[in-house]
């Protein structure tokens, strides 16, 4: 009895096997690419967070040093404002001894008078109190795209300064790295109880604001 040879066409099976193989490779490749993309995004997110944290730390240190008199110049505190009064009680403000750039820009003669006027009424003096007029601290261009930091400065009737800093101009409570700096004033008074010297140098460390 002769054997009947049956020729089977395996090309279809080969094509199916090939398609399954490429499908598996495609899935694996997709998983690898997705994992790489996720890893790259995670790495970029980490870098972004580091940059934001660095921007905040730098701004906080700058404000603490320049407004708080932390940087002593020639062995003396760098934020000292002197006030004199004439016979009519009119005040004159001497800011010549201010050495820090932010100190010089903040403690102008007119602003000093406004702060003391608010103090006389038992009120806070606030600079940058709303989202539309926040102080803005821009990092130098060579800093590589660091985020700007927004600030608000409050001087209370005891002349203590509170600086609030945020990466969000609206000061959202959940904004990362919100920071508060408290700077203590050491004022001097004359015999009539009037402020004659406003001096800073005992600032407390900057603290991250708890949400």
Q: Where in the sequence are the language-model features?
A:
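Conserved functional hotspots that engage anionic ligands or polymers and/or phospholipid headgroups
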Residues: 2-4, 13-17, 65-211
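Aliphatic-rich helix starts adjacent to a transmembrane/signal segment
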Residues: 4-6, 10, 16-55
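Alpha-helix boundary/capping detector
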Residues: 32, 45, 58, 69-70, ...
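N-terminal alpha-helical signal peptides/signal-anchor transmembrane segments
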Residues: 52-71
């Amino acid at each position: 009895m002769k054997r009947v040879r049956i020729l089977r066409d395996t090309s279809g099976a080969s094509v199916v096997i090939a398609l399954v193989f490429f499908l598996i490779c495609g899935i694996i490749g997709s998983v690898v690419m997705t994992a790489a993309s996720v890893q790259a995004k995670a790495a970029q997110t980490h870098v972004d967070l580091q940059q934001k944290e660095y921007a905040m730390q730098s701004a906080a240190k700058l404000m603490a040093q320049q407004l708080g008199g932390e940087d002593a110049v020639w062995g003396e505190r760098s934020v000292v404002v002197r006030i004199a009064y004439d016979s009519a009680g009119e005040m004159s403000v001497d800011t010549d001894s201010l050495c820090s750039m932010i100190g010089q820009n903040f403690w102008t003669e007119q602003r000093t008078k406004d702060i003391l006027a608010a103090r006389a009424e038992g009120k806070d003096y606030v600079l940058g109190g709303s989202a539309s007029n926040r102080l803005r601290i821009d990092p130098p261009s060579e800093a590589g795209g660091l985020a700007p930091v927004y600030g608000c400065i409050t001087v209370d009737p005891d002349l203590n300064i509170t600086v609030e800093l945020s990466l969000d101009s609206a000061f959202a409570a959940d904004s990362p790295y919100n920071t508060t700096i408290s700077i203590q004033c050491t004022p001097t008074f004359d015999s009539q109880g009037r402020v004659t010297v406003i001096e800073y140098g005992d600032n407390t460390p900057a603290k991250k604001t708890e949400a």
